[in-house]
């Protein structure tokens, strides 16, 4: 069933005890179906569960559940070359009834799947962002590094405003000083300069598995990788900037508007060479076109 029944006092409904993951299964060039780095997603869910005091699903249970869902929905895995994939959404919620502010004693772990089309409907094109200085996604020592529902609820107002104003989403800054870049919408951020892949380091940023993979690919391509604070003022020094995450893999950015300072940072109208190479390499690994030398894919046979 696509519906669940729970007590109206379940902690997920009152106190936000909810964590989730986002991952994909691909049909490769060889016809085989593979999931991309599911063990990393499992570890991140365990981290999220610890962050809001929920029972932790074991790694193997998590991965086996995802495999089972893919097998049961095998006919919905899009064909190779379509640019589409089967999206998986593992969810962990507190279902135990609890009126006081305490962790639940019962939890539900579930996984659903749905086919999704290619993210870039009209080709791999850059997008525009604006800086959100009047909204914070997460506090420095809060839940920003966990994939929990509250972080996304906190981004809805600013995200919808950005879309209404013609932007893809907004750039969130560090909540303490509003001078450093945290995230790009629901994705991580990276910039390229002097053959270096630079991505923010902060306790309020969700550790992206896509970003982790791109860092490794950048090193494989002979680039230097820096994980460090990135000030807003440094944007003008980057040759390329982009957002990265499960949905798009890489979303090149060609414009970032800073309303407070009435300043617009601009890049090329077409995706940069490095961003394109990173995107094509990671996509190639996911669908079996490029050798998976780090053994990231888990086959579903």
Place the predicted regions along the sequence by residue:
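Helix-start/capping segments and mature chain N-termini
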Residues: 1-65, 69, 91, 98-301
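Short boundary motifs at domain starts and secondary-structure transition points
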Residues: 77-78, 101
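Extended, Lys/Arg-enriched charged tracts that mediate electrostatic binding to polyanionic substrates
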Residues: 78-93
């Amino acid at each position: 069933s696509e519906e669940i029944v729970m007590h109206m006092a379940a902690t997920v409904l009152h106190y936000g005890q909810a964590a989730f993951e986002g991952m994909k299964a691909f049909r490769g060039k060889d016809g085989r179906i593979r999931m991309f780095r599911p063990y990393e997603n499992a570890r991140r869910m365990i981290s999220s569960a610890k962050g809001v005091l929920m029972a932790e699903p074991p790694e193997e249970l998590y991965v086996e559940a995802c495999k089972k869902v893919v097998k049961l929905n095998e006919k919905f895995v899009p064909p190779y070359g379509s640019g589409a994939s089967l999206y998986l959404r593992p969810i962990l919620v507190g279902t135990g009834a609890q009126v006081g502010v305490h962790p639940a004693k019962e939890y539900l772990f579930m996984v659903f799947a749905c086919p999704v089309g290619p993210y870039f409907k009209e080709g791999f094109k850059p997008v525009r962002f604006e800086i959100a200085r009047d909204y914070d996604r997460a506090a420095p020592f809060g839940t920003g590094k966990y994939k929990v529902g509250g972080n996304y609820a906190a981004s809805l107002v600013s995200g919808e405003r950005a879309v209404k104003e013609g932007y893809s989403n907004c750039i969130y800054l560090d909540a303490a000083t509003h001078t450093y870049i945290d995230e790009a919408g629901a994705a991580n951020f990276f910039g390229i300069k002097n053959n270096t892949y630079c991505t923010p380091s902060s306790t309020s940023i969700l550790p992206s598995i896509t970003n982790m993979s791109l860092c490794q690919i950048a090193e494989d391509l002979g680039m230097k990788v820096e994980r460090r604070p990135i000030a807003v003022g440094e944007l003008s020094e980057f040759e390329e900037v982009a957002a990265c995450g499960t949905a798009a893999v890489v979303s090149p950015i060609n414009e970032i508007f800073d309303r407070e300072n009435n300043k617009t940072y601009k890049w090329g109208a077409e995706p940069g060479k490095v961003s394109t190479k990173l995107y094509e390499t990671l996509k190639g690994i996911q669908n079996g076109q490029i050798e998976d030398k780090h053994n990231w894919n888990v086959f579903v046979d």
